[in-house]
Protein backbone atom coordinates (compact mmCIF):
# COMPACT_ATOMS: atom_id res chain seq x y z
CA UNK A 1 0.00 0.00 0.00
CA UNK A 2 1.43 3.36 -1.06
CA UNK A 3 0.79 5.82 1.81
CA UNK A 4 1.29 8.79 -0.52
CA UNK A 5 -0.88 7.61 -3.41
CA UNK A 6 -3.82 9.85 -2.56
CA UNK A 7 -1.93 13.07 -1.85
CA UNK A 8 -3.41 16.00 -3.82
CA UNK A 9 -1.46 16.75 -6.97
CA UNK A 10 0.37 20.08 -7.04
CA UNK A 11 2.72 22.06 -9.23
CA UNK A 12 4.10 24.50 -6.69
CA UNK A 13 7.71 23.60 -7.46
CA UNK A 14 7.88 25.60 -10.68
CA UNK A 15 11.10 27.59 -11.29
CA UNK A 16 9.37 30.99 -11.64
CA UNK A 17 7.55 33.08 -9.01
CA UNK A 18 3.77 33.30 -9.39
CA UNK A 19 0.56 34.26 -7.62
CA UNK A 20 -1.62 31.63 -5.94
CA UNK A 21 -3.63 31.45 -9.14
CA UNK A 22 -0.53 30.81 -11.23
CA UNK A 23 0.00 34.22 -12.85
CA UNK A 24 3.68 35.18 -13.25
CA UNK A 25 5.22 37.62 -10.73
CA UNK A 26 8.13 39.56 -12.23
CA UNK A 27 8.97 41.56 -9.07
CA UNK A 28 8.58 40.12 -5.57
CA UNK A 29 10.73 42.81 -3.96
CA UNK A 30 8.89 46.10 -4.55
CA UNK A 31 5.30 47.30 -4.22
CA UNK A 32 3.50 49.02 -7.11
CA UNK A 33 3.53 52.80 -6.46
CA UNK A 34 2.80 56.07 -8.23
CA UNK A 35 6.34 57.02 -9.11
CA UNK A 36 9.32 55.89 -7.08
CA UNK A 37 8.15 57.69 -3.89
CA UNK A 38 4.38 57.79 -4.35
CA UNK A 39 1.61 55.90 -2.52
CA UNK A 40 1.10 52.17 -2.98
CA UNK A 41 -1.72 51.21 -5.33
CA UNK A 42 -4.47 48.85 -4.20
CA UNK A 43 -4.37 47.30 -7.66
CA UNK A 44 -1.09 45.59 -6.73
CA UNK A 45 -2.86 42.24 -6.53
CA UNK A 46 0.27 40.29 -5.67
CA UNK A 47 0.98 42.55 -2.67
CA UNK A 48 -2.59 42.29 -1.39
CA UNK A 49 -2.62 38.50 -1.84
CA UNK A 50 0.77 38.14 -0.15
CA UNK A 51 -0.29 40.19 2.90
CA UNK A 52 -3.74 38.61 3.12
CA UNK A 53 -2.24 35.14 3.08
CA UNK A 54 0.31 36.11 5.73
CA UNK A 55 -2.44 37.55 7.95
CA UNK A 56 -4.16 34.16 7.93
CA UNK A 57 -1.17 31.82 8.25
CA UNK A 58 -1.90 30.86 11.83
CA UNK A 59 -4.82 28.66 12.76
CA UNK A 60 -6.25 28.25 16.29
CA UNK A 61 -3.83 26.25 18.37
CA UNK A 62 -4.99 23.12 20.12
CA UNK A 63 -6.66 23.77 23.48
CA UNK A 64 -4.43 21.01 24.86
CA UNK A 65 -1.41 19.32 23.26
CA UNK A 66 -0.56 22.54 21.40
CA UNK A 67 3.21 21.98 21.55
CA UNK A 68 4.14 18.91 19.54
CA UNK A 69 6.44 17.15 17.09
CA UNK A 70 5.63 14.49 14.50
CA UNK A 71 7.41 11.72 12.61
CA UNK A 72 6.49 8.91 10.22
CA UNK A 73 7.31 5.24 10.06
CA UNK A 74 5.71 1.81 10.23
CA UNK A 75 4.16 -0.65 12.64
CA UNK A 76 5.02 -4.34 12.25
CA UNK A 77 3.17 -7.23 13.84
CA UNK A 78 5.52 -9.58 15.68
CA UNK A 79 3.06 -11.82 17.56
CA UNK A 80 -0.22 -13.44 16.56
CA UNK A 81 -3.24 -12.09 18.45
CA UNK A 82 -5.94 -13.14 15.97
CA UNK A 83 -7.59 -15.10 18.80
CA UNK A 84 -8.34 -11.68 20.33
CA UNK A 85 -9.08 -9.43 17.34
CA UNK A 86 -10.12 -9.57 13.70
CA UNK A 87 -8.34 -6.28 12.93
CA UNK A 88 -6.89 -6.68 9.43
CA UNK A 89 -3.61 -4.89 10.14
CA UNK A 90 -2.98 -7.35 12.99
CA UNK A 91 -3.78 -10.39 10.83
CA UNK A 92 -0.33 -12.04 10.95
CA UNK A 93 3.26 -11.53 12.11
CA UNK A 94 5.28 -9.60 9.55
CA UNK A 95 2.43 -7.37 8.36
CA UNK A 96 3.53 -3.72 8.21
CA UNK A 97 1.29 -0.64 8.37
CA UNK A 98 2.34 2.98 7.70
CA UNK A 99 1.99 5.30 10.71
CA UNK A 100 2.42 8.92 11.65
CA UNK A 101 3.04 9.79 15.30
CA UNK A 102 2.67 13.05 17.19
CA UNK A 103 4.32 13.62 20.55
CA UNK A 104 3.35 16.65 22.60
CA UNK A 105 3.21 18.44 25.89
CA UNK A 106 -0.32 18.87 27.18
CA UNK A 107 -1.13 22.07 29.02
CA UNK A 108 1.21 24.77 27.79
CA UNK A 109 1.18 26.90 24.65
CA UNK A 110 2.62 26.08 21.23
CA UNK A 111 5.95 27.82 21.87
CA UNK A 112 6.47 26.70 25.47
CA UNK A 113 9.62 24.85 26.62
CA UNK A 114 9.61 21.07 26.31
CA UNK A 115 11.15 20.73 29.76
CA UNK A 116 8.10 21.65 31.84
CA UNK A 117 6.57 19.16 34.28
CA UNK A 118 3.60 18.08 32.22
CA UNK A 119 2.18 14.86 30.78
CA UNK A 120 3.24 14.07 27.24
CA UNK A 121 0.88 13.17 24.44
CA UNK A 122 1.63 10.00 22.45
CA UNK A 123 -0.75 9.69 19.48
CA UNK A 124 -0.43 7.26 16.56
CA UNK A 125 -2.39 7.18 13.31
CA UNK A 126 -2.31 3.78 11.58
CA UNK A 127 -3.09 3.88 7.84
CA UNK A 128 -4.64 0.41 7.51
CA UNK A 129 -6.34 -1.32 4.57
CA UNK A 130 -9.66 -0.95 6.41
CA UNK A 131 -9.30 2.74 7.21
CA UNK A 132 -7.36 4.73 9.75
CA UNK A 133 -7.03 3.83 13.42
CA UNK A 134 -6.10 6.56 15.87
CA UNK A 135 -4.60 5.42 19.18
CA UNK A 136 -4.56 8.68 21.13
CA UNK A 137 -2.78 8.42 24.46
CA UNK A 138 -0.16 9.81 26.82
CA UNK A 139 3.13 8.74 28.32
CA UNK A 140 1.40 7.93 31.64
CA UNK A 141 -0.99 4.95 31.88
CA UNK A 142 -3.60 6.75 34.03
CA UNK A 143 -5.41 10.09 34.05
CA UNK A 144 -6.49 12.75 36.55
CA UNK A 145 -10.26 12.22 36.30
CA UNK A 146 -12.54 9.36 35.33
CA UNK A 147 -15.54 11.24 33.92
CA UNK A 148 -15.31 13.56 30.90
CA UNK A 149 -17.89 15.87 32.49
CA UNK A 150 -14.97 17.30 34.49
CA UNK A 151 -12.53 17.62 31.59
CA UNK A 152 -13.14 21.31 30.76
CA UNK A 153 -12.88 22.26 34.45
CA UNK A 154 -9.72 20.19 34.86
CA UNK A 155 -8.03 21.85 31.88
CA UNK A 156 -9.08 25.30 33.09
CA UNK A 157 -7.50 24.62 36.49
CA UNK A 158 -4.23 23.48 34.92
CA UNK A 159 -4.11 26.36 32.44
CA UNK A 160 -2.88 29.83 33.45
CA UNK A 161 -5.01 32.06 35.65
CA UNK A 162 -7.44 33.86 33.28
CA UNK A 163 -6.68 37.14 35.05
CA UNK A 164 -2.87 37.04 35.15
CA UNK A 165 -2.11 34.30 32.58
CA UNK A 166 0.18 32.60 35.11
CA UNK A 167 -0.11 28.91 35.97
CA UNK A 168 -0.57 28.72 39.74
CA UNK A 169 -0.51 25.79 42.15
CA UNK A 170 -3.35 27.08 44.33
CA UNK A 171 -5.77 26.77 41.42
CA UNK A 172 -4.57 23.27 40.53
CA UNK A 173 -4.64 21.94 44.09
CA UNK A 174 -7.99 23.56 44.80
CA UNK A 175 -9.64 21.79 41.87
CA UNK A 176 -8.06 18.40 42.45
CA UNK A 177 -8.80 18.53 46.19
CA UNK A 178 -12.34 17.70 45.07
CA UNK A 179 -11.07 14.70 43.10
CA UNK A 180 -9.09 12.19 45.17
CA UNK A 181 -8.99 9.88 42.15
CA UNK A 182 -6.27 12.21 40.82
CA UNK A 183 -3.71 10.95 43.36
CA UNK A 184 -2.57 8.10 41.14
CA UNK A 185 -1.84 10.46 38.24
CA UNK A 186 0.11 12.75 40.57
CA UNK A 187 2.36 9.83 41.55
CA UNK A 188 3.46 9.88 37.91
CA UNK A 189 3.48 13.62 37.27
CA UNK A 190 5.37 14.57 40.46
CA UNK A 191 7.64 11.54 40.20
CA UNK A 192 11.10 11.57 38.59
CA UNK A 193 9.48 10.55 35.29
CA UNK A 194 7.37 13.72 35.27
CA UNK A 195 9.78 15.39 32.82
CA UNK A 196 10.85 13.02 30.01
CA UNK A 197 14.39 13.56 28.72
CA UNK A 198 12.99 13.62 25.17
CA UNK A 199 10.29 11.93 23.10
CA UNK A 200 12.43 8.91 22.16
CA UNK A 201 12.99 7.85 25.75
CA UNK A 202 9.47 7.69 27.12
CA UNK A 203 6.70 5.13 27.45
CA UNK A 204 3.37 5.44 25.71
CA UNK A 205 -0.08 4.31 26.74
CA UNK A 206 -3.54 4.22 25.22
CA UNK A 207 -4.68 5.23 28.75
CA UNK A 208 -8.35 4.35 28.21
CA UNK A 209 -9.81 0.87 28.13
CA UNK A 210 -10.78 -0.30 24.65
CA UNK A 211 -12.30 -3.56 23.42
CA UNK A 212 -10.84 -6.17 21.10
CA UNK A 213 -13.32 -8.31 19.16
CA UNK A 214 -12.40 -11.51 17.32
CA UNK A 215 -14.13 -13.05 14.29
CA UNK A 216 -16.37 -15.14 16.52
CA UNK A 217 -17.61 -11.99 18.25
CA UNK A 218 -15.84 -12.64 21.55
CA UNK A 219 -14.80 -9.42 23.30
CA UNK A 220 -11.94 -8.58 25.65
CA UNK A 221 -11.16 -5.32 27.39
CA UNK A 222 -7.71 -4.12 26.35
CA UNK A 223 -5.07 -1.62 27.45
CA UNK A 224 -2.30 -0.61 25.01
CA UNK A 225 1.29 0.06 26.13
CA UNK A 226 4.37 1.29 24.21
CA UNK A 227 7.85 0.54 25.56
CA UNK A 228 10.89 2.29 23.98
CA UNK A 229 13.68 -0.10 23.02
CA UNK A 230 16.25 2.52 24.06
CA UNK A 231 14.80 2.70 27.58
CA UNK A 232 13.12 5.44 29.61
CA UNK A 233 15.12 8.54 30.52
CA UNK A 234 13.93 11.56 32.45
CA UNK A 235 15.19 14.94 33.62
CA UNK A 236 15.42 15.86 37.28
CA UNK A 237 14.30 19.37 38.17
CA UNK A 238 17.71 21.07 38.00
CA UNK A 239 18.55 19.23 34.76
CA UNK A 240 15.30 20.44 33.20
CA UNK A 241 16.16 24.04 34.06
CA UNK A 242 19.55 23.69 32.38
CA UNK A 243 18.27 21.92 29.26
CA UNK A 244 15.26 24.20 28.86
CA UNK A 245 17.38 27.30 29.33
CA UNK A 246 19.66 26.16 26.53
CA UNK A 247 17.07 24.97 23.99
CA UNK A 248 13.32 25.21 24.54
CA UNK A 249 12.77 22.83 21.56
CA UNK A 250 15.26 20.20 22.67
CA UNK A 251 12.86 17.22 22.34
CA UNK A 252 11.68 18.25 18.88
CA UNK A 253 15.27 18.71 17.73
CA UNK A 254 16.37 15.41 19.27
CA UNK A 255 13.62 13.52 17.44
CA UNK A 256 14.33 15.21 14.11
CA UNK A 257 18.12 14.91 14.33
CA UNK A 258 18.01 11.27 15.44
CA UNK A 259 15.86 10.22 12.50
CA UNK A 260 17.93 12.29 10.06
CA UNK A 261 21.06 10.51 11.33
CA UNK A 262 19.53 7.06 10.86
CA UNK A 263 19.09 6.47 14.59
CA UNK A 264 15.45 5.44 14.25
CA UNK A 265 13.35 5.41 17.45
CA UNK A 266 11.55 2.14 18.12
CA UNK A 267 8.85 1.06 20.53
CA UNK A 268 7.43 -2.37 21.34
CA UNK A 269 3.64 -2.61 21.62
CA UNK A 270 2.17 -4.68 24.44
CA UNK A 271 -1.42 -5.24 25.49
CA UNK A 272 -3.21 -6.30 28.65
CA UNK A 273 -6.57 -8.01 28.29
CA UNK A 274 -9.44 -8.77 30.66
CA UNK A 275 -12.47 -10.89 29.87
CA UNK A 276 -15.53 -8.70 30.60
CA UNK A 277 -17.13 -11.76 32.21
CA UNK A 278 -14.39 -11.58 34.86
CA UNK A 279 -14.37 -7.83 35.54
CA UNK A 280 -15.91 -8.23 39.01
CA UNK A 281 -12.92 -10.27 40.22
CA UNK A 282 -10.80 -7.15 40.78
CA UNK A 283 -10.79 -4.52 43.51
CA UNK A 284 -10.88 -1.84 40.82
CA UNK A 285 -13.16 -1.14 37.88
CA UNK A 286 -11.42 -2.06 34.58
CA UNK A 287 -13.20 0.92 33.00
CA UNK A 288 -11.71 3.36 35.54
CA UNK A 289 -9.05 5.40 33.73
CA UNK A 290 -7.42 6.39 37.04
CA UNK A 291 -6.30 2.79 37.61
CA UNK A 292 -3.59 0.57 36.19
CA UNK A 293 -4.05 -3.14 35.71
CA UNK A 294 -1.42 -4.88 37.88
CA UNK A 295 0.94 -6.76 35.59
CA UNK A 296 1.30 -9.65 38.03
CA UNK A 297 -2.38 -10.54 37.57
CA UNK A 298 -2.93 -9.07 34.07
CA UNK A 299 0.37 -9.73 32.28
CA UNK A 300 1.71 -7.80 29.30
CA UNK A 301 1.35 -9.57 25.95
CA UNK A 302 3.66 -8.60 23.05
CA UNK A 303 2.02 -7.53 19.79
CA UNK A 304 4.45 -5.68 17.54
CA UNK A 305 6.96 -2.92 17.08
CA UNK A 306 6.84 0.63 15.75
CA UNK A 307 9.79 2.27 14.01
CA UNK A 308 9.93 5.97 13.10
CA UNK A 309 12.25 6.21 10.11
CA UNK A 310 11.18 9.36 8.30
CA UNK A 311 10.87 13.00 9.32
CA UNK A 312 7.84 14.96 8.25
CA UNK A 313 8.17 17.10 5.13
CA UNK A 314 6.39 20.17 6.47
CA UNK A 315 5.71 21.09 10.11
CA UNK A 316 2.45 22.91 9.48
CA UNK A 317 0.96 20.32 7.13
CA UNK A 318 1.97 17.23 9.07
CA UNK A 319 2.00 18.47 12.66
CA UNK A 320 -0.34 21.43 13.03
CA UNK A 321 -2.91 20.03 10.59
CA UNK A 322 -2.46 16.47 11.82
CA UNK A 323 -5.61 15.55 13.74
CA UNK A 324 -6.44 12.58 15.96
CA UNK A 325 -9.67 11.27 17.44
CA UNK A 326 -10.25 8.19 19.65
CA UNK A 327 -13.50 7.68 17.75
CA UNK A 328 -11.58 6.68 14.62
CA UNK A 329 -11.34 2.89 14.87
CA UNK A 330 -11.24 -0.14 12.57
CA UNK A 331 -13.06 -3.50 12.62
CA UNK A 332 -11.74 -5.65 15.45
CA UNK A 333 -11.09 -2.70 17.78
CA UNK A 334 -13.97 -1.05 19.60
CA UNK A 335 -14.73 1.34 22.42
CA UNK A 336 -15.58 0.46 25.99
CA UNK A 337 -17.93 2.18 28.44
CA UNK A 338 -14.97 4.00 30.01
CA UNK A 339 -16.65 7.34 30.82
CA UNK A 340 -13.66 9.42 29.81
CA UNK A 341 -13.28 7.57 26.50
CA UNK A 342 -16.96 8.02 25.72
CA UNK A 343 -16.64 11.81 25.97
CA UNK A 344 -13.34 11.89 24.06
CA UNK A 345 -15.04 10.18 21.10
CA UNK A 346 -17.13 13.32 20.57
CA UNK A 347 -14.84 16.04 21.86
CA UNK A 348 -11.75 15.29 19.77
CA UNK A 349 -13.49 15.32 16.40
CA UNK A 350 -15.49 18.37 17.44
CA UNK A 351 -12.40 20.39 18.31
CA UNK A 352 -10.73 19.39 15.03
CA UNK A 353 -13.74 20.65 13.08
CA UNK A 354 -13.43 23.95 14.92
CA UNK A 355 -9.66 24.16 14.50
CA UNK A 356 -9.27 22.87 10.94
CA UNK A 357 -12.76 22.96 9.45
CA UNK A 358 -15.46 20.39 8.68
CA UNK A 359 -13.34 18.72 5.99
CA UNK A 360 -10.28 18.16 8.18
CA UNK A 361 -10.29 14.46 7.30
CA UNK A 362 -9.56 15.35 3.67
CA UNK A 363 -6.21 16.87 4.62
CA UNK A 364 -3.35 14.61 3.48
CA UNK A 365 -2.10 13.46 6.92
CA UNK A 366 -5.64 12.72 8.10
CA UNK A 367 -7.12 11.10 4.98
CA UNK A 368 -7.22 7.31 4.71
CA UNK A 369 -4.78 5.74 2.26
CA UNK A 370 -7.29 3.06 1.26
CA UNK A 371 -10.24 3.51 -1.08
CA UNK A 372 -13.25 5.04 0.64
CA UNK A 373 -16.75 6.20 -0.31
CA UNK A 374 -19.65 8.07 1.28
CA UNK A 375 -22.05 10.94 0.63
CA UNK A 376 -20.45 13.47 2.97
CA UNK A 377 -20.39 16.47 0.67
CA UNK A 378 -19.25 20.06 0.35
CA UNK A 379 -18.62 22.43 3.28
CA UNK A 380 -15.77 24.87 3.79
CA UNK A 381 -12.47 23.96 2.11
CA UNK A 382 -13.72 20.81 0.40
CA UNK A 383 -10.98 20.04 -2.13
CA UNK A 384 -12.02 16.49 -3.04
CA UNK A 385 -12.79 16.25 -6.77
CA UNK A 386 -16.00 14.26 -7.27
CA UNK A 387 -18.14 13.78 -10.35
CA UNK A 388 -21.05 11.64 -9.15
CA UNK A 389 -24.62 12.40 -10.17
CA UNK A 390 -26.09 10.38 -7.32
CA UNK A 391 -25.47 11.86 -3.85
CA UNK A 392 -27.98 9.78 -1.90
CA UNK A 393 -28.32 6.19 -0.71
CA UNK A 394 -29.64 3.73 -1.72
CA UNK A 395 -29.82 4.10 -5.48
CA UNK A 396 -30.19 1.77 -8.44
CA UNK A 397 -27.90 4.10 -10.41
CA UNK A 398 -24.99 3.84 -7.98
CA UNK A 399 -23.29 0.45 -7.47
CA UNK A 400 -21.92 1.39 -4.02
CA UNK A 401 -23.26 -0.88 -1.29
CA UNK A 402 -22.79 -1.58 2.37
CA UNK A 403 -19.48 -3.01 3.50
CA UNK A 404 -19.51 -6.57 4.88
CA UNK A 405 -20.72 -6.71 8.46
CA UNK A 406 -18.08 -7.16 11.13
CA UNK A 407 -18.48 -8.12 14.80
CA UNK A 408 -18.84 -5.54 17.57
CA UNK A 409 -19.39 -6.10 21.31
CA UNK A 410 -22.82 -7.60 21.85
CA UNK A 411 -23.30 -7.27 25.62
CA UNK A 412 -26.83 -6.39 26.75
CA UNK A 413 -27.00 -3.29 28.93
CA UNK A 414 -29.78 -2.49 31.40
CA UNK A 415 -30.12 0.30 33.94
CA UNK A 416 -31.77 3.56 34.89
CA UNK A 417 -30.75 7.00 33.67
CA UNK A 418 -28.55 8.35 36.44
CA UNK A 419 -25.54 10.54 37.16
CA UNK A 420 -23.41 8.72 39.72
CA UNK A 421 -19.82 7.92 40.62
CA UNK A 422 -18.65 4.36 39.91
CA UNK A 423 -19.03 1.91 42.78
CA UNK A 424 -15.37 0.83 43.06
CA UNK A 425 -13.51 4.10 43.61
CA UNK A 426 -10.61 2.70 45.67
CA UNK A 427 -8.70 5.96 45.20
CA UNK A 428 -5.78 5.39 47.57
CA UNK A 429 -4.49 1.82 47.20
CA UNK A 430 -2.58 2.10 43.92
CA UNK A 431 -1.01 5.54 44.68
CA UNK A 432 0.28 4.15 47.97
CA UNK A 433 1.67 1.01 46.35
CA UNK A 434 3.44 3.06 43.71
CA UNK A 435 4.99 5.39 46.29
CA UNK A 436 6.23 2.46 48.40
CA UNK A 437 7.86 0.86 45.35
CA UNK A 438 10.42 3.70 45.12
CA UNK A 439 13.76 3.91 46.87
CA UNK A 440 14.08 6.50 49.70
CA UNK A 441 15.83 9.11 47.53
CA UNK A 442 13.07 8.98 44.92
CA UNK A 443 10.43 9.23 47.63
CA UNK A 444 12.20 12.26 49.05
CA UNK A 445 12.23 14.05 45.70
CA UNK A 446 8.50 13.35 45.33
CA UNK A 447 7.86 14.81 48.77
CA UNK A 448 9.92 17.91 47.99
CA UNK A 449 7.88 18.61 44.85
CA UNK A 450 4.68 18.32 46.84
CA UNK A 451 6.00 20.60 49.58
CA UNK A 452 6.77 23.20 46.92
CA UNK A 453 3.24 22.92 45.53
CA UNK A 454 1.54 22.96 48.93
CA UNK A 455 3.57 26.01 49.96
CA UNK A 456 1.73 28.29 47.54
CA UNK A 457 0.85 31.31 49.73
CA UNK A 458 -2.71 31.47 48.39
CA UNK A 459 -3.45 27.88 49.35
CA UNK A 460 -5.80 27.72 52.34
CA UNK A 461 -5.30 25.64 55.47
CA UNK A 462 -8.41 23.66 54.51
CA UNK A 463 -7.03 22.64 51.12
CA UNK A 464 -3.63 21.70 52.61
CA UNK A 465 -5.39 19.58 55.21
CA UNK A 466 -7.40 17.78 52.55
CA UNK A 467 -4.24 16.90 50.63
CA UNK A 468 -2.48 15.71 53.78
CA UNK A 469 -5.50 13.51 54.49
CA UNK A 470 -5.45 12.09 50.98
CA UNK A 471 -1.74 11.26 51.03
CA UNK A 472 -2.05 9.79 54.54
CA UNK A 473 -4.75 7.45 53.26
CA UNK A 474 -2.43 6.41 50.44
CA UNK A 475 0.56 5.93 52.75
CA UNK A 476 0.64 6.91 56.43
CA UNK A 477 4.36 7.73 56.48
CA UNK A 478 4.01 9.90 53.37
CA UNK A 479 1.28 11.95 55.01
CA UNK A 480 3.33 12.31 58.18
CA UNK A 481 6.43 13.47 56.29
CA UNK A 482 4.45 16.03 54.31
CA UNK A 483 2.80 17.38 57.47
CA UNK A 484 6.11 17.55 59.32
CA UNK A 485 7.93 19.42 56.58
CA UNK A 486 5.04 21.82 55.99
CA UNK A 487 4.86 22.71 59.70
CA UNK A 488 8.60 23.37 59.70
CA UNK A 489 8.30 26.05 57.00
CA UNK A 490 8.19 29.59 58.49
CA UNK A 491 5.35 30.72 56.23
CA UNK A 492 3.16 27.84 57.34
From Swiss-Prot:
InterPro entries: Catalase, Catalase_AS, Catalase_clade1/3, Catalase_core, Catalase_haem_BS, Catalase_immune_responsive, Catalase_sf
Keyword terms, alphabetized: Cell membrane, Glyoxysome, Heme, Hydrogen peroxide, Iron, Membrane, Metal-binding, Oxidoreductase, Peroxidase, Peroxisome, Phosphoprotein, Stress response, Thioether bond
Tissues showing expression: Highly expressed in mature leaves. Mainly expressed in leaf blades, stems, panicles, leaf sheaths, and culms, but barely in roots.
A Pfam family this chain is assigned to: Catalase-rel
Subcellular location: Peroxisome; Glyoxysome; Cell membrane
Position of the 3-(S-cysteinyl)-tyrosine (Cys-Tyr) cross-link: 325-348
Sequence motif Peroxisome targeting signal, location on chain: 484-492
Top enzyme class: oxidoreductase
Substrates-to-products reaction catalysed: 2 H2O2 = O2 + 2 H2O
Binding site for heme: 62, 102, 151, 344, 348, 355
Keyword Phosphoprotein included in the entry's annotation: yes
pH dependence: Optimum pH is 7.
Mod. after translation: Activated by STRK1-mediated phosphorylation at Tyr-210 upon salt and oxidative stress.
Gene3D superfamilies: Catalase core domain
Activation and inhibition: Strongly inhibited by beta-mercaptoethanol, sodium azide and potassium cyanide. Slightly repressed by 3-amino-1,2,4-triazole (3-AT). Activity is repressed proportionally to increased concentration of NaCl, KCl, LiCl and MgCl(2).
CDD domains, sorted: catalase_clade_1
Any one of the GO BP annotations: cell redox homeostasis
MF (Gene Ontology): catalase activity; heme binding; metal ion binding
Consequence of substituting residue 210 to D: Phosphorylation mimic exhibits higher catalase activity. Impaired STRK1-mediated phosphorylation
A cellular component term, taken from the record's GO annotations: glyoxysome
Deletion phenotype: Impaired catalase activity in leaves. Accumulation of hydrogen peroxide (H(2)O(2)) in leaves, which consequently promotes nitric oxide (NO) production via the activation of nitrate reductase, thus leading to subsequent NO-mediated leaf cell death, as well as increased S-nitrosylation of specific proteins including glyceraldehyde 3-phosphate dehydrogenase and thioredoxin. Leaf bleaching and cell death; these phenotypes are reversed by melatonin treatment. Increased tolerance to zinc oxide nanoparticles (ZnO NPs).
Main localization category: other
Family: Belongs to the catalase family.
The protein's assembly and partners: Homotetramer. Interacts with GLO1 and GLO4; these interactions are disturbed by alpha-hydroxy-2-pyridinemethanesulfonic acid (HPMS) and salicylic acid (SA). Interacts with STRK1 at the plasma membrane.
Protein name: Catalase isozyme C
Gene name per UniProt: CATC
Amino acid sequence: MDPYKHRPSSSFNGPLWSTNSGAPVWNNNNSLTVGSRGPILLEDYHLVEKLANFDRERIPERVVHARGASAKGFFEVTHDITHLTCADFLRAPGVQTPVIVRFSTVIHERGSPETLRDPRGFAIKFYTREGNWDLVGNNFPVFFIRDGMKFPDMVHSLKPNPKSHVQENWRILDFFSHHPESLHMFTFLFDDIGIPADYRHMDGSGVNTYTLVNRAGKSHYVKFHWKPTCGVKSLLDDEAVTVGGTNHSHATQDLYDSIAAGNFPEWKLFIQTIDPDHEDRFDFDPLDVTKTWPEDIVPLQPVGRMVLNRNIDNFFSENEQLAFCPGIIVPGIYYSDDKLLQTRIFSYSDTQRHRLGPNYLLLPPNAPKCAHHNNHYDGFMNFMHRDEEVDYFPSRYDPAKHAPRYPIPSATLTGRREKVVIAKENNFKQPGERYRSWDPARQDRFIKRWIDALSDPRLTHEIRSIWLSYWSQADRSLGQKLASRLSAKPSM
